[in-house]
């Protein structure tokens, strides 16, 4: 502890070099924290969905395939099913914003039974059921867009050739890890609009867009099961029922369904870990070069220290501690700073519904800090060994 002032003064001896080393460390770690947090959040959302006992049915050929709306009623009648709802992605524009938030066409009667972690006031839910053009939005979406009950919410069709002129009838809330930026509107209203486009295109003699011909498509079916142990058998039963139909299905748990999106991006886990390793290697070179230059400038000073009685071990300790101090400051700014930044700045509204929330957990922040300390230790080890074993005579020759 008595050498801390000396170590601190050495770290400040070349302020430009120290600041650049700290800045490079903090920026690299800040970006690495974002990548690790993104992977952790995707995994966390998938794992937390286990407790809700839900399975998801989609077309066996992927999202491009159709799931007839009639399947929802048939699945609802199966043993072990609490409720089922269509969950059809709309993907419209709001005030010319492309993909501003997630939008789904659902069954007003069952959606909040299936998604029972979401809560909405009974009178608002009743208004949603009674008004065909009504919608229920998340509390965070209402806050972001300054929407309230009775406000219009026009969505311009992008994937579909129809516009949804909605009215906010309810605002739902939910757990901290739930998506509270969704817009849920009635499937029957959406389907009727698609049918009108199909009919008008056919009567006019023109070819209707492919999406307009897909009225009656549930997209996916979210199914609430009574217990978790029946989910595998129930999923198999659903798939067996439609195996030989024109629209075979694939049913999986909500956890597997959520992880499927990450799998669509490729081997995301390996890519993120590879980038993280590259960041660590780059930091080793940056910090190592900075410490090597610092030790070359202090050859005479190290020789004087050893001449007045400083042991090799003490010289080694002083150099290593300086390297760890510089890297640790960069790590604190980058890793802990990212934690504080994303705790106060919510970037989820700018992800178009892809991420319901974003934060850097303490585990990831501490991991980043540990990485910076390792970088400091590893980058300072070689210069410290050279300094500890340097010749006093050769060092003092440079004294003028």
Name what the model sees in each region.
Residues 26-104, 109-110, 120-131, 143-144, ...:
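Hydrophobic, regular-secondary-structure patches
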Residues 15-42, 262-301, 324-331, 375-378:
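Hydrophobic alpha-helical transmembrane segments of multi-pass inner-membrane transport and secretion
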Residues 38, 42-45, 222, 227-284, ...:
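Peri-transmembrane interface segments
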Residues 55-61, 141-142, 205-241, 249-250:
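A short beta-strand structural signal in non-transmembrane regions
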Residues 87-88, 97-107, 118-203:
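Hydrophobic secondary-structure segments that place a key small or acidic residue at a functional site
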Residues 1-32, 44, 48, 320, ...:
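N-terminal Sec/SRP start-transfer signal
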Residues 279, 292-346, 367, 371, ...:
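Transmembrane alpha-helical interface segments in multi-pass membrane proteins
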Residues 337, 350-382, 394-400:
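Conserved transmembrane alpha-helices of multi-pass membrane proteins
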């Amino acid at each position: 502890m008595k050498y801390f002032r000396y170590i601190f003064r050495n770290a400040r001896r070349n302020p430009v070099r120290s600041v650049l080393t700290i800045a490079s460390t903090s920026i690299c770690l800040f970006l690495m924290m974002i990548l690790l947090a993104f992977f952790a959040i995707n995994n966390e959302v998938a794992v937390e969905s286990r407790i809700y006992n839900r399975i998801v049915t989609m077309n066996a050929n992927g999202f491009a395939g159709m799931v007839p709306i009639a399947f929802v009623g048939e699945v609802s009648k199966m043993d072990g099913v609490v409720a089922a709802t269509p969950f059809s992605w709309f993907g419209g524009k709001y005030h010319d914003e492309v993909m501003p938030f997630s939008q789904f066409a659902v069954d007003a009667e069952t959606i909040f039974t299936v998604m029972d972690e979401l809560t909405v006031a009974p009178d608002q839910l009743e208004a949603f059921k009674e008004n065909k053009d009504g919608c229920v939005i998340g509390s965070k979406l209402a806050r972001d867009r300054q929407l309230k009950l009775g406000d219009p919410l026009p969505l311009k069709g992008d994937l579909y050739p129809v516009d949804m002129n909605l009215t906010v009838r309810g605002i739902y809330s939910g757990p901290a890890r739930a998506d509270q930026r969704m817009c849920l509107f009635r499937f029957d209203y959406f389907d009727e609009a698609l049918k009108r486009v199909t009919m008008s295109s056919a009567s006019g003699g023109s070819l209707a867009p492919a999406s307009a011909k897909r009225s009656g498509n549930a997209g996916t079916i979210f199914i609430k099961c009574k217990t978790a142990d029946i989910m595998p058998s129930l999923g198999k039963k659903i798939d067996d029922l439609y195996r030989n139909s024109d629209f075979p299905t694939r049913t999986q748990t909500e956890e597997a369904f959520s992880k499927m999106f990450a799998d669509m991006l490729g081997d995301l886990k390996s890519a993120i870990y590879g980038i993280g390793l590259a960041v660590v290697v780059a930091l080793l070179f940056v910090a190592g070069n900075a410490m090597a230059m610092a030790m070359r400038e202090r050859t005479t000073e190290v020789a004087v220290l050893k001449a007045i009685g400083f042991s090799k071990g003490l010289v080694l300790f002083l150099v290593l501690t300086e390297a760890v101090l510089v890297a640790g400051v960069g790590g604190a700014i980058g890793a802990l700073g990212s934690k504080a930044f994303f705790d106060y700045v919510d970037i989820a509204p700018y992800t178009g519904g892809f991420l319901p929330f974003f934060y850097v957990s303490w585990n990831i922040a501490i991991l980043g800090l540990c990485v910076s300390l390792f970088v400091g230790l590893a980058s300072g080890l070689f210069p410290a060994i050279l300094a500890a074993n340097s010749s006093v005579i050769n060092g003092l020759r440079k004294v003028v």
